[in-house]
Each structure stands twice: as C-alpha cells, then as structure tokens.
Amino acid sequence: MKILVTGVAGLLGSRLAEWILSNTDHKVIGIDDLSGGYTENIPKGVKFYKFDLKNLSRIDKLFNKHKPDIVYHFAAYAAEGLSPFIRKYNYENNLISSTNLITCSIKHDIKRFVFASSMSVYGNKYEPPFHEDLQQCPIDPYGVAKFAVEQDLKIAYEQHGLKYTIVRPHNFYGQNQNIWDKYRNVLGIW
C-alpha cells in the first residue's frame, strides 16, 4: 500500500510516517513546503517532495506517478490567533491547499482521506469535553477554513464516494515539534 502524508516534516506527519515505516511494509510519500517543519524530521525511507499544496498540477503529477492509496492530510498553517490578520494566507494554505488534495483524491480514486482538522471548529461556545454532536461555530478564519474543509469532505463523499476520516486534535506536543513559532505549538513553548 502507498500512503501520502502531507506536512511530513512537521510533528504529526513525521511521527506518523515513522510509525508506518517501522510497523508496516507500506510505502510513504511525503509532501512539505518546509514552512513549519524541518527536513531533519523526515524519516529515512520517505519519498519526499518539497512543494506548495496550492499547486494543483504538481499534486496531480505526484498522484499520477505514485498512485497513493491513502492520504493523510496534516499540512496546515496552524496560527489560529494570527489568522484574523493573515486571512488570505490562512485561506490559501488551509482551505485551497486542502481542496486541491481532495480534488486529486477524487480524480485518482483514493481509498481514504484522513484530515487533521481542529477543535477550533467549535469556537468558544462550549466548555470541554467536546463531542462530535456539538454544532460547529468557528470564530476565526483558521476555524472557518478547517470547518469548510470538513464540509467539502462530506460533499465529496456524497457526490463522489470519497471515504474520509476527520480528527480534531488540539494543543498536542511531542518530538519533532517546531517550538520557535510564537503563534503555534503553545504547549511546546510553555
């Protein structure tokens, strides 16, 4: 099986790629633009491509070449607090990039698309613990972008049969985390 991991130089992507390579015989293809991750984080054995996911034709060429079975989409610019001030950048990197991947996943009949969304889709209307039945009501552009991608995945399933899984992590930390960005990865700095 061939697995595509976006954000492969970041915390989640690199750790997942390492686990897959250590525990399965699957091949891992990784994409990252290195805006928040480091090449040192990419495990040996990953077929790595450095490019921007806003480039739809480049994604399509990669899908044609490698024919991945599963996509783990972990790439994002996760600066929730900064997102009201970088609206265009936020939507390009968190919404357009994601819809490009979804488009190629439909075209190439991907078996499953796993999307790292965010707890930010719930806004500040609720107190933890959160559950999936709560209404999403994001309050900033980052949460809006993540919510829009979730909705796009639901429609892609209904219209094209693209199977998907959505996870909504929040404030995770660990090995390979970028601790230098003051707008992201708060627990790593704390």
Regions found by a protein language model. Give the residues of each.
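A general alpha-helical scaffold signature found inside nucleotide-binding enzyme cores
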Residues: N93-I96, N185, I189
